[in-house]
Amino acid sequence: MPKISKRLASLAGKIEDRAYAPLEAIALVKDNANAKFDETMEAHVRLGIDPKYTDQQLRTTVALPNGTGQSVRIAVVTRGEKVAEAKAAGAELAGEEDLVESISKGEMDFDLLIATPDMMPKVAKLGRVLGPRGLMPNPKAGTVTTDLEAAIKEFKAGKLEFRADRTGIVHVRFGKASFSADALLQNLKTLQETIDRNKPSGAKGRYWKSLYVTSTMGPSVEVDFSALQDIEQGS
């Protein structure tokens, strides 16, 4: 078992074993984010679902109002005039069969892959390469589309795709430690609303089990998710 560093143990000692009010939890994580770089803020949500059943799977997108603070490299598989359209809209990579061939060889210098529907039969053959990395385009995630300009701009502006892992936990980055606490709270609230709005039809019993927020190098802080749900956007 890996040892906890003295620094992390020291920081964790400042945190009480209880669920904090949302803004208080965010402020506490920000205070402990003292690495030499701008740490990423992360939310980890344990849900009462069993993703091995198709009606208990969660996969969707969220458009964070204040963005993520991270740049996203986008690749687009399309054809014809849409290759130039994708590049003009801000995609770092765009191509036809040539890009599919590069990806099949493991050349994946991108964070997100978008495809037009006519190219999905070719992209689908890349499942062994894209699947384990969570990069396979999906209509529900907005990454299979003919409106490339809108999709690219949305993802560049902070739209994120996320899913529950096989244990029913959602892991989402929701900003940077340099963001104001209010901006981070707005992002976290939007994430909570998205998770609630996309509750799987087969979910049984208590849907939310726990919510923790943390930063890249900091300790986790439990959040009172009921208090988060009670917050009205704009309040």
From Swiss-Prot:
Keywords: Repressor, Ribonucleoprotein, Ribosomal protein, RNA-binding, rRNA-binding, Translation regulation, tRNA-binding. The keyword RNA-binding applies. Signal peptide: none annotated. One of its GO terms (molecular function) is structural constituent of ribosome. Part of the 50S ribosomal subunit. One of its GO terms (biological process) is translation. GO terms for cellular component: large ribosomal subunit. This is Large ribosomal subunit protein uL1. Binds directly to 23S rRNA. The L1 stalk is quite mobile in the ribosome, and is involved in E site tRNA release. Protein L1 is also a translational repressor protein, it controls the translation of the L11 operon by binding to its mRNA. The keyword Ribonucleoprotein applies. NCBIfam families: rplA_bact. It comes from Synechococcus sp. (strain CC9605). Belongs to the universal ribosomal protein uL1 family. Transmembrane segments: none annotated. InterPro entries: Ribosom_uL1_bac-type, Ribosomal_uL1, Ribosomal_uL1-like, Ribosomal_uL1/biogenesis, Ribosomal_uL1_3-a/b-sand, Ribosomal_uL1_CS.
